From Swiss-Prot:
Component of the ubiquinol-cytochrome c oxidoreductase, a multisubunit transmembrane complex that is part of the mitochondrial electron transport chain which drives oxidative phosphorylation. This is Cytochrome b-c1 complex subunit 7. Belongs to the UQCRB/QCR7 family. Coiled coil: none annotated. InterPro entries: QCR7, QCR7_sf. It holds the Pfam family UCR_14kD. It is linked to Mitochondrial complex III deficiency, nuclear type 3: A disorder of the mitochondrial respiratory chain resulting in a highly variable phenotype depending on which tissues are affected. Clinical features include mitochondrial encephalopathy, psychomotor retardation, ataxia, severe failure to thrive, liver dysfunction, renal tubulopathy, muscle weakness and exercise intolerance. One of its GO terms (cellular component) is respiratory chain complex III. It is found in: Mitochondrion inner membrane. It comes from the Eukaryota. The lineage of its organism: Eukaryota, Metazoa, Chordata, Craniata, Vertebrata. One of its GO terms (biological process) is mitochondrial electron transport, ubiquinol to cytochrome c.
């Protein structure tokens, strides 16, 4: 029983650090999500290309708004900041699929 409590406590502690870092990074103050800030290598570019139109348009809106705010040296009002609890990693499933396909192609090329 004590082991479960220790795991639960360490999970809460780790989650607290994640929330702190999410807010400390600052991208949420510009209305960006974590996946909006990923470096765009070839895999990420392909995953972005595969996004449904509505997700792609939402992403572009957030990025353009953040660029505009950054240029003006402003941030959004606090009620418009993206929240850790509301974060959905919209690009992750597409990126995993692209990486899996690339690795599969590399395996086929070895044979």
């Amino acid at each position: 029983m004590a082991g479960k409590q220790a795991v639960s406590a360490s999970g809460k502690w780790l989650d607290g650090i994640r929330k702190w870092y999410y807010n400390a990074a600052g991208f949420n103050k510009l209305g960006l999500m974590r996946d909006d800030t990923i470096y765009e290598d070839e895999d990420v570019k392909e995953a972005i290309r595969r996004l449904p139109e509505n997700l792609y348009n939402d992403r572009m809106f957030r990025i353009k708004r953040a660029l505009d705010l950054n240029l003006k040296h402003q941030i959004l009002p606090k009620e418009q900041w993206t929240k850790y609890e509301e974060e959905n990693f919209y690009l992750e499933p597409y990126l995993k699929e692209v990486i899996r396909e690339r690795k599969e192609r590399e395996e086929w090329a070895k044979k």
